[in-house]
């Protein structure tokens, strides 16, 4: 597992998220996302240091 540096879409603050190696981050948004039908795409919640909840979508 690797640590990715991501930016909060609400305020631009940088936050870290542990993700499996060799994934591609597709989006970081404040809008709640449901799990896609594609087994190779996942959505995980996270929050920045300012408390903004965001959703990270990534593909294996």
From Swiss-Prot:
A zinc finger (C4-type) spans 8-52. Activates transcription of bacteriorhodopsin (bop) and phytoene synthase (crtB1). May interact with DNA or RNA via the zinc finger motif. The gene is brz. It comes from the Archaea. This is Transcriptional regulator Brz. GO terms for molecular function: zinc ion binding. It comes from Halorhabdus utahensis (strain DSM 12940 / JCM 11049 / AX-2). InterPro entries: Brz_Regulator (IPR053463). It holds the Pfam family Zn_ribbon_Brz. Belongs to the Brz family. Keywords: Activator, Metal-binding, Transcription, Transcription regulation, Zinc, Zinc-finger.
């Amino acid at each position: 597992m690797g640590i990715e540096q991501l930016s909060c879409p609400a305020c631009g603050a940088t936050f870290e998220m542990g993700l499996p190696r060799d994934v591609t981050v597709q989006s970081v948004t404040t809008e709640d996302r449901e799990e896609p039908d594609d087994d190779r795409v996942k959505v995980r919640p996270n929050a920045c240091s300012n408390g903004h909840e965001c959703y990270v979508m990534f593909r294996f």
